[in-house]
Amino acid sequence: MSTQTLIYCVGAAKAGTSWLFDYLYNHPETYFPTVKELNYWNSVALGAGEFYRGELARRKGEIAARHAVTRDEDIHAYQLQSMADIEEWLVTFDGKTRDDKAYLGFIGAGLRDAKLVGDFSPGYALLGPEWFAEMAKSHENVKFLYLLREPVDRLWSHFRMNAGGDEAAATSMVDGYLSGGEENVARRSNYRRTVKRLMQAVPQDRLHVELYERLFTEEALEKMCDFLGIEVIPADFGKRVHGSPEAGLDPARRARLQSALKPQYNFIERYMGAVPVEWQERMVAA
């Protein structure tokens, strides 16, 4: 068998990572635990382990509640596996003690039948280059993936998710961001910083950057699978995975967000040679 690849998808949040994880989870040449967003490296690096352990415990409770009323046998089985995987991960990693061997074992590194294993944790986008370098050394064949979405759309989707469908609350978060608040979401919107840090630590041929707006196409999927070293299988491009509740963003706020995010547009223009046409189509006159 060819050398197994370990893929780290470092985000961005609300840029298609859940859809891609679902596609790869169901791929016959891969192995992934059901737990997306293990947050191992940022727990060790940033001391955020207790928060993420709490999030996983909460997620397990939500799955248990759905499991109690589920009648579909396939969904029932997946829910059982999800709860078991969460419990195993909470036992494997205490949220603070670095144990790369145990972590790699949990994600399937070394499994004979898996050409691809990995970890999809958008929180890794906040890490420094020294930690990307550590991740790159964790396995003999490590690659990195970073998905980018039109900056205002990504930010708005993130606020809608945080607001749980409350459009007024999401709009208030936008206003807070424009006033210099919402620091966590702001940091996750900094494509320039994350790409630069990745480029400091990761060889160019080990990094694949793709646009959310192009992800759901045969062409993008073929490039992705070629990079990952697996065959392309049919995809459900219409499947919605963890999408944010629908809500509109008024043109005035969109224009102000575009202005606030201008450094990101400028960087991507330099990095990709032009602002993607899909992004230009979403922009409004300031």
Predicted regions and their residues:
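PAPS-dependent sulfotransferase catalytic core
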Residues: 1-102, 106-111, 120-121, 174, ...
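Acidic-and-aromatic substrate-binding clefts and catalytic sites of carbohydrate-active enzymes
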Residues: 93-97, 123-128, 185-186, 213-218
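Conserved phosphate-donor/acceptor-positioning beta-strand/loop module used by diverse small-molecule
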Residues: 138-159, 213
